[in-house]
Amino acid sequence: ETDEKRRKRERRNAEKKAEALLAQADKMRAKATKAVAAQNMARRAERLLAGVEGERVTDQVAKIRFPDPAPCGKTPLRARGLSKSYGSLEVFTDVDLAIDKGSQVVVLGLNGAGKTTLLRILAGLEPPDTGEVKPGHGLRLGYYAQEHETLDVSRTVLENMQTAAVELNETDTRKILGSFLFTGDDVDKPARVLSGGEKTRLALAMLVVSAANVLLLDEPTNNLDPASRAEVLHAINTYAGAVVLVTHDEGAVHALDPERVLLLPDGSEDLWNEDYADLVSLA
């Protein structure tokens, strides 16, 4: 048995065990008395998957290219007067943002300033306390969530892609998944057993088939090996649609070459200049 075959066998075994543990944990969570045991089972599953996460052939790189965005109006997304608090904790107040066709905006702020919350509100996944988000003519929104909550972990890789690529047949969907290194039986795995890097690639693949004209990207280079990160940076750099980016990665900001910066929590806007680059890694 070659090393590669052995690694594949070990990975399959680990995934089966992890899937069984996660299924059992889901059942136990329904009972309050077993909540701690369920949490421990989920952690065991995570450790199993972490042990085999780096076993893919390193010379394979996901081919990431965003297609031309769908046609849209001059300002496909606009937000006015957004505020958000959690209990007595005020996250941000009175944020205005107009995303014009093809514009590039980077959102900066210290941890806890509400960057992820703002993207979730813009994506329609969380309501603001005050203010409103107004979609413009032809808006087609793509959202990349750093915690991968846009993935349905109960569905397979292929099923997740099919929800994003309703206009594609299964053969074409499988081809695109193959370009993101999901081949053969990989497409039949439940998303819940994927490693962090695999979830990132699947979420990016779903963005690619969406033909979005506005991308909301929350830490899109996390969990990627250097070669795949370079592919993501190139895809961002060549994308013709509008982008709102949250990142700690200076390389991602330089790839975007933003026109504007939005500073949280006060919601002030400025034209981008390199003086802001020092804030990226601190954000």
Q: Model segments located where?
A:
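Coupling and communication elements adjacent to P-loop NTPase active sites across diverse families
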Residues: T2-D94, A98-K101, A283
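ABC ATP-binding cassette signature C-motif
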Residues: E1-K5, F66-A283
